[in-house]
Amino acid sequence: MARRPARESGGPIEPTKTNREKIIEAMMELLAEERVEDIGFGAIARRAGLTLADCRAEFRSVVAVVAAYTKEIDRQVLAGGDTDTAEEPPRERLFDVLMRRLEALARHKAAIRSLARSARRDPALAVALNGLTVRSMQWMLTAADIGAAGPKGMLRGQGLALLYASVLRTWLDDDDPGLARTMAALDRGLARGARWAGLLDELCRFVPSRCCPPGRSSRRPRDAAEEEPAAA
């Protein structure tokens, strides 16, 4: 039977956690200390107190661990939805959703900063992270009750991913507990996103087959459309 290596420093990982959760936590701890390109499964296994076989059973690559972390953040944000915001305008709902996301990320801020720096140096990593972010942003749009399905939803997701990346840069340098700079950047970004969404709606009027399913109008009734100024 393979021995499980002793866990390296970084604070104890709760024994009740699954191997998958231990690996994700170990990855984020290591990311706070070094570049993602320097992190391998050997280091992750040692930090998590697991074997390489345990790691291989859960993940195929280091980027897959990052993807699993992103998915877990999505889950936390979606689980923490506030029904009191249901009557708010879409832009306000999306603002609340994205601020919940940043709150969920706060514990691993140093790791996120490290990952962002690596992405600026590595185009392939940047492309992979963009794909993860677009998928996450489609879930965030859905959480805000803003359409995120189909080609139009993909465009909204990509637009929101770009906006989110910009806000994330502000957040990484915002040491104010109240996150005043971050909230201001997000508010400005969502205002720009609403204008961009209006242009997207106009485009879909002329290219309905690409933006809307066959047999359905490319534009919602006027009164309904005005209630959904999508952010991206």
Regions found by a protein language model. Name each.
Residues 31, 63-73, 77-81, 115, ...:
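Alpha-helical DNA-contacting segments of helix-turn-helix folds
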Residues 1-34, 43:
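Basic, helix-initiating cap at the start of DNA-binding domains
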Residues 2-5, 173-232:
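C-terminal peripheral helix-coil segments that are non-catalytic and often amphipathic
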Residues 22, 30-68:
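Helix-turn-helix
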Residues 40, 113-115, 128, 149, ...:
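Short, hydrophobic secondary-structure boundary micro-motifs
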